Amino acid sequence: MGKKGGKKRQHRESALLGALATQDESRLQVRRTPKLYIGGAFPRSESGRTDVLSLARGGSANIARASRKDLREAVKVARAAAPGWASRNASLRGQIMYRVAELMEGRAAQFRDDLVAHGYGKSDAADEVAASIDRLVWFAGWPDKLPAVLGGTNPVASSHFVFTIPEPTGVVAIVAPESSPLLGLVTRLAGVLAGGNVAILLASEGAPLPSVTLAETLAVSDVPAGVVNILTGRRAELMPHLSRHADIDGIDLWGCPDELLIDAERGAAEHVARIARRPHGEKDRASAFTGERGERIDGMTAFLEMKSVWHPIGS
């Protein structure tokens, strides 16, 4: 009876596995629908437009194509979130950024798949994901150290104590690097957040999937809604409006294409926005973000204002 019972059980298990395999082959896979990330939500573009992006290993993805109105909405929610993020304890901001790194570690396979879909080899993709997580941890250690490193007490001739402290610029727009769609993206974004700024990120046009996955990661992290907003779409369409928006305080133009760079700088100058850009003559290269080249304090100081406070000395 024991042998017969065992054979019957094996037969039932084989039949069940076969049925599950057949079911798996017959079901339709739930396809990913990448959207914008604005104010902690995932809206489609108000225009309803999408761009069809061909993937390196076959297949395609429908990427939301942000409009001028989507950009205005992102600026609106970023401005509303700016005071709360800037006023948070600096140590807490660092802990929140570290939590994002933890969540990225848990989604490492998804980030790797995104990079492979854009033409990376599996080994190179794994290396970039690991480096991106490490980079975020590096920046997460800085928020509570910036006042000590950059601030100080200034000697003056009058009877005053003079203290200088760094303060965030406010709303910063970031044009993500095309050359490094994850590591470059994390490097530029983390520097802005560490300084207490809020961000509107214009994702890589050619490789937007890592930005989409980062948005999905931020949505379940402790980063408050509106602190990071991510738009996908066409840079030639969005850059003129982004650079000239009067409620954007700073623009990181590292990933801006050469043909759009001069117009973007002119647009920023019209409302005196701070800008950061790659050095003159330097191309948007992935090597700029690898190793110690990406671990630079100027990624934070580019969007910090130095405020001096004068306090009279009593007699």
Tell me the role of every PLM-derived stretch.
Residues 72-76, 84, 94-109, 119-149, ...:
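Long amphipathic alpha-helix in the N-terminal Rossmann-like dinucleotide-binding domain
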Residues 124, 160, 237-238, 260:
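Short acidic active-site motifs
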